[in-house]
Amino acid sequence: MIIGRLFLNHPLLSYQRDEHCFISRKESKNYSLLQKLSETRGISKCMRNNFYMSGEYIRKNPTLGIEDTSWKLTKIIPMVDEFIRDSSPKKATLLDAGGGAGLILKEVSNRLKRKGVTVTKYALDLSKEMLQRQKENNPDIKAMLNEDISETSISNKGIDLTLMVDVLEHVTDTDKTLKELNRISKYVIFKIPLENNVYYNTLDLIKRGRLRRDLIQQVGHINSYNFKALKKKINTSGGEILCYNFTNVFEYYLSAECQKQMVTGERTLYRIANLISTISPGLCSCLFTDFVVCIVRYR
């Protein structure tokens, strides 16, 4: 049976920003209730933050998701180039929020430098241990901020470009986080899973809410988006999406490395999703769980 196992146990879902949340079966009865819990902070900020600050995250995720960093960079670098085209910077302050091992920060910085941009790097994370990992891979970081991205000490428009890679789905207050990003940053690059789709919602109905509960408990996703709702939230926060792409993650799933861990049913489903994504990426994201990568300009 691929129901219940599909996607959730796939290696790509060992995100750099995974976090553990505790919620009862009754509370996770259905998707709409989970959304309500998230919006009302039913999953407490303190509970969420403790997973990072206690060091539990690193103990459970020792690789910090470095295995899929190269794939992520193929989707993120085009957004970095869009930032350069739109802003023509001579120098740039670069913030990585929830950046795991810091490899994406390192490569984005290198890309900017190759384009003639002088870069000043910052890292922000709830975990001091995670920040130390960032420092190991980015010894030239100017400052490491042990803070919550929804409430920072950064000055107004103090950052030119912020990286939010697999982070927004974890925050307890999406609107507050986007508002804070508007305050502190001129541009933001997001990578976000689109988990409010036909496939996930159908499985959740069949499993009586257990799929959404598993998403919370296994990978810490307390927010589920589709692109339309996400775009509306970004626009409401004062952001303008300059460029976006659906990632067609199914192409990655079908790579030789990932296929070693698949059963036949998974390969078949990914092939179907990959075909649909090739024809209509937007439609595919409504049917199956893909990611969107976008760059947002804030004024």
Predicted regions and their residues:
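S-adenosyl-L-methionine-dependent methyltransferase catalytic module, highlighting the catalytic core
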Residues: 13, 49-69, 172-298
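Active-site acidic short loop of glycosyltransferases
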Residues: 156-159, 173
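A conserved beta-strand element that flanks and buttresses the S-adenosyl-L-methionine
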Residues: 163
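Hydrophobic adenine-recognition pocket in adenosine-nucleotide-binding enzymes
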Residues: 167
